[in-house]
Amino acid sequence: MVKFKHKTDKRDSNLRQAFIKLLLKHPVRDVKFSGRKISLTFFGHRLSDKIVSLREPHVAEWSRRRKEIFIDKKISTNDRRKSFKALCVHEVIEKFLTEHFGFRTDKESHIIATQKEKEYLKYLGGNWESHELIVYWDWHSYGEH
């Protein structure tokens, strides 16, 4: 009986990894910003959330209760507009994957969302290294490590 459970766990793990690889290859489409909302299509699902700009110690976060994402107000300035948009894409996708597929936020959803954030930033003509520095210094300005 123990061997059977082990084989099932291994098979489930392999299927999960294959699904993650599939999601990593799947593009984000039709990204639109309208007022304080973002909408996009990912993996055949139309997703939308309200964007709230406030003091956010984790740079960006998503609500577990409402259709909202939170982006630190320092990132929403005009000189950081591309980073702001890329972070919005990241949060919407991370929220969707965690809620819809039950992925672990830090180990699975975050990896996929970061890849989609990077792809979208490249599409906007942004620089990934500059974006990472903006996020890094914003995160550390609140004493996070």
Please tell me what each predicted stretch does.
Residues 1-3:
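Intrinsic-disorder-driven secretion/translocation and chaperone-binding regions of pathogen effectors
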Residues 5-82, 99-145:
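Metalloprotease/metallohydrolase-associated module, dominated by Zn2+-dependent proteases
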Residues 86-98:
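Active-site recognition of the HExxH zinc-binding catalytic motif
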